[in-house]
Amino acid sequence: MKNILFVLYEDFHSNSALHVHHFANNLVELGLDCAVAVPRNKHTVSLVGENLTNLYQVTEYGEFYRLNECFKNQKGPDVVHVWTPREVTRNYCRKLRKAYDFQLVIHLEDNEEYVLEKYLNKPFSEIANANGSLNIPENVSHPQRYKEFLATANGVTVIIEKLKEFVPNNVPTLTLWPGVDTEHFSQRKPNPERAKQLGVPDDNIVFSYTGNVHAANTEEVKSLYLAVALLNREGQRTTLIRTGRDFENFLGDDDSWARQYAIELGYVDRSLMPEILALANVLVQPGKPDKFNDYRFPCKLPEFLAMGKPVVLPATNIGLEMENEKDALVLPAVDATHIVDSVTKLLQDKSLYKKLSDGSINFAKTHLSWQKNTKLLLSFYKEI
C-alpha cells in the first residue's frame, strides 16, 4: 500500500477539506503518497490557509483517467477514502472502479438521513418510500444508494462513535477524531490592535463564533445571537464576532435586534482565526442532544479547546467524552438562557474560569493530535 486518494464532496471551501488536508499531509510525512480529488475548482486548495502548505497533489473528478499521474510511481490509488457517501462522491467512485482497483474506505461525519430530511423538508420515511419520484441532488446522500455504497466498502471511518449505527455489521469501522493545529491555535492574549481594527468596543464581553449557518443549525446559532442581545438588555455590554456564511435567513426579516451587537466578517482566511478566537472571553457551542448533534463532531470545537478559553457545550457528541467543570462546562442543553447563565457564572468565578481554561488545553493535547490520529488511520488502512 502506497497511494492514497481522498475524495471530497465539495472543493476546499468545505470544513471537511481541512480534515482531509491534515490527514493527507500527515500520511505523506509517514511515507505515503497522497492526492485529493474535488468535483471542481482544485485551485481552492489555497483556502486551507496561507500557513498550511499541501504536501499532496490535487485533482478534479474530470481528470480521473490520468489519476495515476498524481502519484510518484505513476500507478493508481491503493486506497480511496471517500468524504462522505453523498451522490456526487458515489458516482465518482463508480467511474473510478472502471479504471482502477483499490480498497474503498468511506468516512461518515453526519447523520446523512437527517441532513437529507432538512434539505428536502420532508421526513426521511417519506423520502425513502418515494420510489424514485423525488429528485435527490448530488450534494446529499440518496436514501437507499448510500446504504448500498457503505455495504461495498472495505472499511468505514466515523467521526463520532454513534455513527456506527449506520454502518453494516460486517464492515470494519474506526472512530476517527480530527485534530487541531496547535502551532497556530494556542493560548494567547487578545491582540488590542486586532480588536480595534474589527471595531470591538473596549471592556465588552466578547463571544467568537466561527461557522456557517445552514438548515440544520439555524436555531442553535440564533440562540447565540439571542444570548448576546439578552446580556446587553441586562446591562452587560456584549459583542459577538462571527465568521462564516449565512445559507438561511435565520434571524427573520427584522434582524436589527441581533445584528446591532454582532461584528460579522463573512469568510475570512484561516490564518486570522486564532486572533479572532483569542478576543473571546468564553467560547460557546450552542445546541442540544438531537438527531443532528448526536452524530457529529463540530469542526470548530478542537480549535476552541486549543485556545485555552473556557468552552461551553451541550452533553452530546464530544461533550459526552468530557468531564463537566474539568474539561469544559457541559450542559444538558446550550440555549440562550443557559448561555447567559454560564457566561455570567464563569466571569464571576475566576477559579472555575482558570480551571476550564487549563482543562480545555489538556483535552486538546490528549485527544486531538493530527499526528496520533493519522497513525490510527494508517493502521486501519493496513488492517483492511
Could you tell me what each predicted segment is?
Residues 1-50, 75, 155, 228-229:
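N-terminal subdomain of nucleotide-sugar transferases
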Residues 338, 345, 352-367, 376-379:
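A short, well-ordered alpha-helix in the C-terminal region of glycosyltransferases
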Residues 95-99, 108-116, 122-156:
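Membrane-proximal helix-turn-helix segments that form the acceptor-binding/catalytic region
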Residues 12-18, 216-222, 269-276, 281-302, ...:
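Nucleotide-sugar-dependent
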Residues 59-67, 245-249, 262-278, 334:
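Conserved active-site histidine-acidic residue motif and adjacent donor-binding/catalytic loop
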Residues 325-336, 345-351:
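Conserved acidic donor-binding segment of nucleotide-sugar-dependent glycosyltransferases
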